[in-house]
């Protein structure tokens, strides 16, 4: 069990109250979970569902496979690199997003996320559009250009600072701190590692992650319309 308490309080008093309410049980020892081996290949590249929606919703995904030995520090560094890449590819300040928005292909800034645990990991780009296939096509083209030509130094530095700022802002909210610490703890991560590891994320490392994960054979498109 994990408990996170954030706010203006005296730690000693909170700990005393928690201890009063804990039920004493014998130590059952460490629980070792055995998970099935995940396939590296995607299940299906395209899926379409029919629902009553005013505008088609889409999700473009990239499958990432965790190594046999999950390393929290490596996961943190990779997470930062992917956040930078997603913002460079189709974030609000990217050329691709501006073009898609001006042409009315995408309605608003897409959701960008990288979800990972001990067993699985994937990248998600989500939003609403009357032409999700065109968005997927343009993402492929942008990724291909980045892979072939490398990342623009100035663009990379600007987005890198933006991502760091996003992390720092999280600490302005007590609720965000609690959510962040709880989620990271379940992955074996110290939330402060993000601030420390940010300094080690170089343009070269981000380009390696781009080539390793953003592959067309790992890409899927799901549409609800």
Model-identified regions with their sequence ranges:
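Active/ligand-binding-proximal structured segments within catalytic/core domains
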Residues: 60, 73-89
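Charge-rich, well-structured scaffold segments of protease-associated domains
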Residues: 1-31, 72-73, 86, 93, ...
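An aromatic/glycine/proline-enriched structural segment found at the starts
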Residues: 2-68
């Amino acid at each position: 069990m994990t408990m996170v308490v954030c706010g203006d309080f005296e730690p000693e008093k909170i700990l005393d109250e928690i201890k009063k309410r804990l039920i004493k049980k014998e130590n059952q020892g460490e629980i070792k979970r055995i998970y099935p081996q995940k396939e590296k290949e995607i299940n299906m590249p395209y899926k379409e569902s029919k629902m009553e929606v005013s505008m088609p919703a889409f999700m473009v995904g990239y499958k990432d496979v965790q190594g046999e030995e999950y390393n929290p520090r490596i996961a943190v560094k990779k997470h930062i690199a992917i956040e930078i890449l997603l913002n460079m590819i189709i974030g609000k300040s990217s050329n691709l997003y501006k073009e898609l928005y001006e042409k009315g292909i995408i309605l608003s800034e897409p959701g960008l996320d990288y979800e990972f645990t001990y067993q699985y990991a994937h990248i998600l780009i989500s939003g609403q559009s009357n032409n999700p296939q065109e968005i997927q096509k343009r993402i492929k083209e942008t990724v291909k250009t980045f892979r072939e030509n490398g990342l623009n130094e100035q663009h990379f530095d600007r987005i890198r600072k933006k991502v760091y700022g996003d992390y720092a802002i999280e600490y302005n909210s007590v609720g965000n701190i609690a959510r962040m610490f709880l989620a990271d703890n379940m992955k074996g991560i110290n939330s402060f590692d993000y601030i420390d590891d940010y300094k080690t994320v170089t343009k070269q490392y981000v380009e390696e992650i781009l080539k390793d994960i953003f592959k067309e054979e790992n890409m899927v498109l799901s549409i609800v319309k």
